[in-house]
């Protein structure tokens, strides 16, 4: 087939824009062929662009050349057409298409390019493995659901820029090549050719730079910024990701929260037409853990924790009494009305499930009309059983699922059990968007791997004022001026008020196990800057990918990122990372010490 050019042909409309009000209008459309079907003496071609689809009609009785050319059109051919918009007859209206009231009667057709048969259908909800989709990502991105996701992402960032600009924020870019200050996830390192033996790090966040901007007097800053973390991937993690980042001077927590509730209210209304209620619930960290076993609770459903430690602390069942005696707890959830759906097989499966989270197993009591179904009631007295039933408000049809262990194990295991039960029994209302703030976090958490306290958020978080005196003596009891914004059980953003005094910052580093010299080696630039009139300041950063993922109703952030990585941190379309020339390594003063055989290199190149 001979291909043509646009020449003097100029597009007048996008495919998805047309409707009955355009009747008799002459239009020029361009896009991809989605379908081609013949009915009598008419060819019907569905034309697609990013705005949607429209039906084209080619009639052999009016222009045989154009009609014959249309017969050879195949899926994903790129074409341009000129024609007239006609209203469909009532019986031919397609109510499933936004453009279903009209069709375009084509008088001129230009075939701009052909296409091989794609490896998967270019349509919504395809059943294709992710590796194939990502290898041919340029085709995957043509699919309507992916294009909707990308357009939603664009809307969110556009609304963010408008909102923060209107609220006095300046958009300022911070460096991509910065200093490695390892504390938390691993850095991606970039070797310096000019200063051999030295490395830049790609930023895990713009944290220190945005604090410097507050020192510099810019008052309110924001940025849509790429960040990098060399860590193991999950469904909602990528090695490179996007933050909507902000920092403010001379503010308290209420001011930061109010500004961000205003932003979320605006973005949901303008991007999705959804009204969300503000202010959001604020829940202290300890309350979140005691009620849900999580610092990012999903509040779209119940199944809240019930502490039955007092009811069983003296019982004959050593799993329970021993847990309480050793400083742990016994907690449960009441799965109301679903006891008859929890067979012994399902209960055993759930018991195995919690072992993933270091629990030794799960106990249960299923309340039936005239009896109890349980593997533990034989170890409990009637009074203890009645106390449990009373505390859990259990009635026939309910199932009480119980975990006993150290508190951190109980929180983790029962919290994940709560989510698993909700998923299995469809207890989650996916139409809801439930926001809340989690506040009053611990400043530190203990790392058994490192045998020291590490920062719960980051080492620049300001302690609660009345807890500062405990930094050296009771670090486990120091609270942070920190806050996370939670949506449907996912942390979509987090922030804090920052330390703005060099002496307090040095005390913080000491509590984290840094010597004076180590602290100044890594962060001396910040503590030096604090000597020159630092204002009180604080901020917040959203995980933009995760926020858009939830808004779009996707299961993975890969579906809202144009060119994501897979779990091996590979990008399958361009096949990165890749080997580089020996000459490039020599220029950097780098020698590869890990042997790579030719077969492995060839396989990597052909992934």
Question: Model regions: which residues?
Answer:
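Class II aminoacyl-tRNA synthetase catalytic cores and aaRS-like
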Residues: 1-607
């Amino acid at each position: 087939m001979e291909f043509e050019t646009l020449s003097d042909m100029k597009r007048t409309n996008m495919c998805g824009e047309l409707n009955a009000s355009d009747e008799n209008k002459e239009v020029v459309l361009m896009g991809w062929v989605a379908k081609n079907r013949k009915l009598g003496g008419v060819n019907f071609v569905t034309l697609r662009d990013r705005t949607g689809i429209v039906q084209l009609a080619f009639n052999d009785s009016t222009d045989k050349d154009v009609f014959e050319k249309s017969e050879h059109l195949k899926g994903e051919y790129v074409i341009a057409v000129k024609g007239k918009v006609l209203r469909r007859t009532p019986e031919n209206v397609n109510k499933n298409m936004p453009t279903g009231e009209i069709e375009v009667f084509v008088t001129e057709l230009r075939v701009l390019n052909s296409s091989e048969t794609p490896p998967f259908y270019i349509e919504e909800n395809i059943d294709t493995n992710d590796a194939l989709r990502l290898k041919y990502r340029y085709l995957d991105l043509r699919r309507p659901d992916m294009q909707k996701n990308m357009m939603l992402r664009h809307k969110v960032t556009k609304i963010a820029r408008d909102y923060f600009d209107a609220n006095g924020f300046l958009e300022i870019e911070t460096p991509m090549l910065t200093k490695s200050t390892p504390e938390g996830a691993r850095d991606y390192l970039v070797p310096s050719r000019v200063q051999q033996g030295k490395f830049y790090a790609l930023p895990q966040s713009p944290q220190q730079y945005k604090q410097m901007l507050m020192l510099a007097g810019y008052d309110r800053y924001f940025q849509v910024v790429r960040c990098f973390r060399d860590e193991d991937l999950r469904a909602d993690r990528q090695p490179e990701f996007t933050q909507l980042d902000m920092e403010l001077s001379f503010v308290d927590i209420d001011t930061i929260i109010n500004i961000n509730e205003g932003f979320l209210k605006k973005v949901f209304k303008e991007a999705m037409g959804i009204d969300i209620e503000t202010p959001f619930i604020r829940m202290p960290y300890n309350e979140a853990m005691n009620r849900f076993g999580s610092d990012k609770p999903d509040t779209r459903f119940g199944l809240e924790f019930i502490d039955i430690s007092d009811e069983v602390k003296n019982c004959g069942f050593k799993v329970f009494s021993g847990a309480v005696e050793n400083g742990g707890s016994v907690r449960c959830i009441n799965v109301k009305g679903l006891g008859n759906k929890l067979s012994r097989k399902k209960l055993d499966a759930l018991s195995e499930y919690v072992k993933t989270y270091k629990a030794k197993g799960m106990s249960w009591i299923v309340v039936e009309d005239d009896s109890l179904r349980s593997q533990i009631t034989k170890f409990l007295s009637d009074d203890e059983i009645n106390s449990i039933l009373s505390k859990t408000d259990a009635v026939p049809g309910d199932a009480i699922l119980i975990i006993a262990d150290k508190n951190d194990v109980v929180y983790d295991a029962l919290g994940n059990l709560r989510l698993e039960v909700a998923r299995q029994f469809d207890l989650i209302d996916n139409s809801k968007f439930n926001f809340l703030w989690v506040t009053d976090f611990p400043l530190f958490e203990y790392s058994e791997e490192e045998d020291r306290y590490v920062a719960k958020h980051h080492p620049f978080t300001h302690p609660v004022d009345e807890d500062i005196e405990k930094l050296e003596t009771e670090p486990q009891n120091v609270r942070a001026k920190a806050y996370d914004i939670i949506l449907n059980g996912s942390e979509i953003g987090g922030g804090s008020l920052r330390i703005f005094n060099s002496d307090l910052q040095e005390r913080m580093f000491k509590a984290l196990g840094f010597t004076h010299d180590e602290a100044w080696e890594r962060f001396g630039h910040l503590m030096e800057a604090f000597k020159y009139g630092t204002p009180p300041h604080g901020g917040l950063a959203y995980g933009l990918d995760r926020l858009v993922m939830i808004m779009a109703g996707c299961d993975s952030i890969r579906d809202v990122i144009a060119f994501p990585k897979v779990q091996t941190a590979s990008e399958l379309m361009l096949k990165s990372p890749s080997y580089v020339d020996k000459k490039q390594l020599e220029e950097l003063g780098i020698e590869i010490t890990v042997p790579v055989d030719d077969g492995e290199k060839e396989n990597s190149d052909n992934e």
